[in-house]
Amino acid sequence: MSETFEKRQLYGGAIEIDIPRRFIDVTSYRHIPDHQELFSDEKSDQSVIIELNEFQDHISNANAIKHHYEVLVEDAGISTDKSVILNFRELTQAEMPNFDASIPKYVLLAQQKIAKFNETAENTINIYMALVRLEKSKTDLLITFNEAIALAPTSSSVAVVQNLTPSNDQSKSEQLFLTMLKSFKIKDYSLFVHN
């Protein structure tokens, strides 16, 4: 079954991205920080997060994506033995064609064991993270796709997730993420004006 994508307007229309239609805008029912946009699909336990973060000028381009991932892990309170970076690489111009080739772009795949909300049951999650370094705009732009690949039997996700296949087709998930990245476009750079 192929995905049906829908163009989503972010940050008041300043950015657009194609996201699968099955994902809903979480801001319609939950408060999300102003620097983030969040979409989720409860039935697959997948989510997409777009974040505008301060440019980390003290970190090299090659290490910046690892830095942002480590901040995510630390903020979530995940111990280092429950999180691993599987690989990371530079994105090609063809993978993010709406950005000049001179703009540094990276992608990372990691895996975490993490409990939802206040639960103790830990699910195994694949994290696909992309970083676009907008030095002139003083912004590190993150796009993250989270996908549960194994659910603990007592996790609250078990009751709502449909058809989670333990074998997990990682290449299909990676292709889904790359399709989103290919569509990602900044339409109005005044979004990044700092006072």
Swiss-Prot record:
Q: Which Gene3D superfamilies match?
A: Mog1/PsbP, alpha/beta/alpha sandwich
Does Kinase show up as a keyword for this record?
A: no
Pfam families recorded: Mog1
The GO biological-process annotations, alphabetized, read as:
protein transport
- Report the SUPFAM superfamilies cross-referenced here: Mog1p/PsbP-like
Any one cellular component term from GO for this entry?
A: cytosol
GO MF entries = guanyl-nucleotide exchange factor activity; small GTPase binding
Q: Does the keyword Ribosomal protein apply?
A: no
Entry superkingdom:
Eukaryota
Q: What keywords are annotated for this sequence in UniProt? A: Guanine-nucleotide releasing factor, Protein transport, Transport
Q: Please give the family membership noted in the entry.
A: Belongs to the MOG1 family.
Q: What does this protein do?
A: May regulate the intracellular trafficking of ran.
What is the designated name of this protein?
A: Probable ran guanine nucleotide release factor
Species per Swiss-Prot/TrEMBL record: Dictyostelium discoideum
